[in-house]
Design a protein with these regions (language model features):
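Short Fe-S-cluster ligation motifs
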Residues: 103-133
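Short Gly/Ser/Thr- and Asp/Glu-enriched loop/turn motifs at secondary-structure junctions
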Residues: 66, 134-136, 306-310
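Short, acidic Gly/Pro/Ser/Thr-rich loop/turn segments
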Residues: 78-81, 198, 268, 321
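C-terminal accessory extensions appended to soluble enzyme cores
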Residues: 6-29, 282, 286-336
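Surface-exposed helix-capping loop/turn segments at secondary-structure junctions
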Residues: 119, 229, 299-302
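Conserved AdoMet/S-adenosylmethionine-binding subsite of the radical SAM
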Residues: 122-285, 289, 293
């Protein structure tokens, strides 16, 4: 298949993503779904299929990586321009994203299956594991873009849960009213708290449309204790920029009182290489040192870590994720 037909194959017939962005995403093995959505197979999904190695979510939360689908309802829109984001730059305009949530879920599963086709018959992949992967058990809504900009997010979460699929939603926390209004909450809500204070936030996270984004993030953190779901504050730590500042991070974490805190070292990959240097990557030892200092300041301890991902889990106890009760089956004729 030549490059242009490959790109066309990976594009949704109804996509409204700008052609230049769509072509870049397709070249990076995204399958575009709906008007603004996209799916991409995670590195760790492939690792578990081939080598029985799961990602840190397996260690921390009991997630089976081969059963995880990585997607986003809006891969092309974000209201921040974070310097450390490894994804492609997003559209400079904010269009309303209102894809039908059932269509988005089914098309995402179909795209995920298409992307896994090449693993069938691979010498290192058991047919049983490949068949299990055809029906995802977990959806990581974390691929690209800011998912709380999707106007039908609560309906999408409900449809996932009705199919017995857990949801992991990663948000930058800049839209607290949207989170507050969600009728259905994700199985686990991650809030990216990637700067210790407003000055560093504005330098690293670069709000595109709202100069009060830091204050909005603080409102989201204040909201977390009232939400009836699992919550996580995630700190992406950039050496020479945001690593350290334990007292500032402790203030934010104590405000949010999350079930878990993840401290993760910045990785010098993708688009972020335009803004950072390899010396901005902390070692796993430095992430561990940060975590051991922070943990007692928030009444928690370091529960686990994964050196290859430079990440630690801070909390009170490890509690594995449980799947929602399945009320609906995927259509038998869903196909790819």
């Amino acid at each position: 298949r030549d490059v242009m037909s490959e790109v066309a194959y990976m594009q949704s017939p109804i996509t409204k993503i700008e052609p230049q962005i769509a072509a870049k995403l397709s070249k990076q093995r995204y399958h575009l779904v709906g008007e603004h959505g996209g799916v991409k197979v995670c590195h760790w999904t492939k690792e578990e299929l081939k080598n029985d190695r799961h990602c840190y979510k397996g260690t921390f939360y009991g997630i089976q990586s081969s059963g995880c689908m990585q997607m986003a309802p809006n891969v092309d829109t974000c209201n921040l321009a974070c310097t450390y984001c490894w994804r492609e730059p997003h559209s400079e305009t904010m269009t309303k994203i209102d894809d039908d949530p059932e269509m988005l879920f089914y098309e995402s599963v179909r795209a995920h299956r298409r992307l896994l086709t090449g693993f069938k018959g691979h010498k290192d992949v058991s047919i049983e594991k490949w068949e299990e992967a055809q029906n995802p058990k977990h959806v990581a809504i974390s691929l690209n873009g800011e998912p709380t900009l999707y106007s039908r997010l609560a309906e999408f979460l409900e449809i996932c849960h009705d199919h017995g699929v857990s949801t992991f939603l990663v948000t930058n926390g800049s839209l607290p009213r949207t989170i507050e209004r969600l009728d259905t909450l994700p199985t686990q809500l991650y809030v990216s708290v990637d700067a210790p204070n407003k000055e560093i936030f504005n330098k690293l996270c670069k709000p595109k449309f709202n100069s009060n984004s830091w204050e909005q993030l603080e409102k989201t953190l204040e909201l977390l204790p009232s939400l009836d779901t699992r919550t996580v504050c995630r700190h992406t730590l950039i050496k020479n920029h945001s690593l350290g500042y334990h007292e500032d991070y402790a203030r934010l974490d104590n405000l949010a009182d999350p079930d878990f805190i993840e401290a993760k070292g910045y990785v010098y990959v993708g688009h972020s290489q335009n803004n950072h240097t390899i010396s901005d990557m902390p070692s796993h030892a430095e992430v561990m040192e940060f975590s051991r200092t922070l943990a007692p300041m928030v009444g928690r301890e370091v529960l686990a870590d994964r050196s290859e991902s430079r990440v630690t889990l801070i909390g009170k106890e490890i509690i594995p994720v449980t799947l929602p009760e399945q009320k609906r089956m995927l259509p038998k004729d869903l196909g790819i």
